Amino acid sequence: MQVLFINLPYYGHVVPTIGLVQELIAQGCEVTYLMPFGWEDIVAESKAQFAGYQNHKQLSEQIKNAYAAAEQIVERFDMIIYEQFFFLGKHLAEQ
């Protein structure tokens, strides 16, 4: 199963997901973690593949950038897991 994991760049949101991503991989899933460029090392800890987008100081711009990046690759995935502040995740998953 191909899983797209979408998160925003906040340590308190990302670090708790590392174990979940590792478990998904252990169960045979191929996980791609979508995060801003600069977070490659954190994603590498989970063993997921990294997909990047441009970071921004404003949350609204982070969400727009994450959505634009996800929209480019979403069709490759069977499942999308997204964090609570990425409210466009539901719309993305319904496409």
Residue ranges of predicted features:
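Glycosyltransferase specificity loop/lid
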Residues: 1-95
